[in-house]
Design a protein with these regions (language model features):
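Switch II of P-loop NTPase G domains
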Residues: 126-136, 140-177, 189-199, 203
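Extracellular structured ligand-interaction cores
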Residues: 61-63, 131, 218, 272
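Short, flexible boundary segments at extreme N-termini or domain junctions of P-loop NTPases and their
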Residues: 1-71
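Short, flexible loop/turn elements at secondary-structure junctions
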Residues: 68-70, 138, 150-153, 279-282
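Conserved G1/Walker A P-loop phosphate-binding module
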Residues: 40-124, 141
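Conserved GTP-binding G-domain of TRAFAC-class P-loop NTPases and closely related GTPase folds
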Residues: 3, 170-172, 176-308
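Short, flexible hinge/linker loops that cap or flank conserved catalytic cores
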Residues: 57-58, 137, 213
């Protein structure tokens, strides 16, 4: 693909020397069931997501929305980013005001957040950290907040035309600036997204999202599980041009809504978004059938953080 230059304020990684970030949990998370007692939602809300109630108390900092289908790796991305940011001096903690004070499920999730982030059996944490707002601080000053919520509320492969629940529309329309991190992955790493028609419908859902976004919002495509592709030639040595082309080939017209229509800037910026690749780490199956997590190289979360 010639002269592909996504952009959203920072220099876009069209060459092999720029940023990347992705993940490698493959098929693992498609097998994990979700317990309404531990994932931050009540049984009623699990049955009807339009009943979900949220509060974004801090309107002064951006919301980083992790947007993608089930099993695409959003939760492990949050876990990996939390570990990385804490290792370089940031404070990362759940926002307890995000859910009603009467919600004991969410309170329990907040109480156990540190344990779930730090445990070796990180794959098990994806069963629990399913709906949460996490704030990032530097020396006591809030920087941003990450929103993690179930992928099926963004795009459900078995019901691809489902409307967004009310709470997602509330987030789209609230006054915070948003950074939308849109997840893609190799065609073979998620059985729920393995056929081209489903991926095309996901592209359509992203197009619908784009039509609702404010001009203040930014978009980052996160090509996850990059270690499952042939485009990695070593840490930091990513063939970005081929990685971008692979996303275009696998997700029909996914970039089309972000075409730069400005007659001047489109000459050097074909699209208006950023593109990163990511890998959380490695997952090893143990003798008891569970998966242990080994943290990946800091290159990937570092580059994603630079783009945020």
């Amino acid at each position: 693909m010639a002269d592909f230059e996504p952009n959203s304020g920072a220099a876009a990684p069209a060459q092999n020397t720029k940023p990347a970030s992705i993940q490698s949990q493959s098929h693992i998370f498609g097998k994990i069931s979700t317990s309404p007692e531990t994932n931050g939602l009540s049984g009623e809300e699990m049955r009807d997501p339009n009943k979900i109630k949220i509060t974004i108390a801090d309107t002064s900092i951006p919301i980083v929305v992790l947007f993608g289908p089930p099993s695409c790796g959003k939760t492990m991305t949050l876990i990996r980013m939390t570990r990385f940011l804490r290792s370089v001096g940031y404070t990362v903690e759940p926002d307890r005001s995000f859910r009603p004070s009467t919600d004991g499920h969410y309170e329990n999730l907040c109480d156990n957040f540190d344990n779930m982030v730090s445990q070796i059996e990180a794959a098990d944490s994806t069963d629990k950290i399913n709906f949460m707002l996490v704030k990032v601080f530097k020396e006591g000053k809030p920087i941003c907040q990450f929103l993690e919520s179930p992928g099926e509320y963004y795009f459900k492969p078995s019901d691809p035309y489902a409307q967004f629940p009310f709470y997602i529309n509330d987030i789209i329309n609230n006054k915070n600036r948003k950074i939308w991190v849109l997840f893609t992955e190799p065609s073979h790493t998620n059985r729920l997204m393995s056929d081209s028609q489903t991926r095309g419908l996901y592209s359509q859902k992203i197009s619908k999202l784009k039509s609702k976004l404010s001009s203040r919002d930014r978009v980052i495509f996160l090509n996850n599980k990059i270690d499952e592709t042939p485009f990695v030639n070593g840490i930091g040595k990513i063939n970005y041009r081929q990685a971008i082309k692979d996303v275009q080939n696998n997700y029909d017209n996914i970039f089309a809504p972000f075409k730069n229509l400005n007659p001047i800037t489109k000459l050097w910026q074909e699209y208006r978004f950023d593109f990163v690749v990511f890998q959380s780490g490695d997952f090893v199956k143990t003798e008891d059938g569970s998966y242990s997590f080994s943290v990946g190289n800091d290159y990937y979360p570092k580059k994603l953080w630079e783009f945020l």
